[in-house]
Amino acid sequence: LDKEIIIDRVADILKDTPSAEQIVKKGDNRHKRFRILARYMVEKAIEKDALILESDGLGIAILFETFPNEKENFWKESKENLNLLFNVTGFKNALKILKNQKYIQQQRPKEGAYLYCWFWGIVQNSRGTDSKVGRYMKDRFLKIAERDKLPLYAETQTKKNVIVYRRYGFELFHTWKRDDGNTMWFLRYIPKSLGGIGDPNL
């Protein structure tokens, strides 16, 4: 599937995602800002071999294998972050985003490798509780967690997503009532090999 098509689809999904809606600066050319953010996410996913696609590209996930003490290339990260600051978030949002990210990262493991679901979305006309695309995507990344014997972490600001995650064997381990009035739920999937209940349907 062409990378530009994937970027377009991720950009459209991000518009329906509360966390992305909050960080992308409002005003003219907002669609362009969402697309810049989508390009950054997709290219980072490809670089890290973390992009998961449903066969028709209707479902897209980004699943990183993460190490708590892993260091990124400072200059490369700085250039990318400045690009996001100028073209996506704007300066007003920057401090709040950094504060929120620090809190989110504090909820993740302090040692040992783990999987982190940075993004999981389905194009609009393929969504729904009975979506084959959703089940396919879920099976893909839970099988990776089981295969690699690594816990899988995710967070969401959408209550109905919490219900779906829990149906798939995730446990809700933390709830954050944010200063802006929004709520964020933190979830993790512990593979059966690590003593978790796993997904009963897997």
Model-predicted segments: where are they?
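Conserved GNAT acetyl-CoA-binding A-motif
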Residues: 113-116, 144-157
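A short beta-loop-alpha structural element at the N-terminal edge
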Residues: 1-16
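Conserved active-site alpha-helix within GNAT-family acetyltransferase domains
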Residues: 147-149, 157-175, 179
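Conserved beta-hairpin
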Residues: 46-64
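Conserved acyl-donor/pantetheine-binding loop and adjacent beta-alpha core of acyl/acetyltransferases
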Residues: 60-125
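Conserved acetyl-CoA-binding loop-helix of GNAT-fold acetyltransferases
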Residues: 128-143
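Conserved beta-strand-loop-alpha-helix junction that forms the acyl-donor binding cleft
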Residues: 118-125, 153-162, 179-180, 190-191
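Active-site rim helix/loop that mediates acceptor-substrate recognition in acyltransferases
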Residues: 28-50
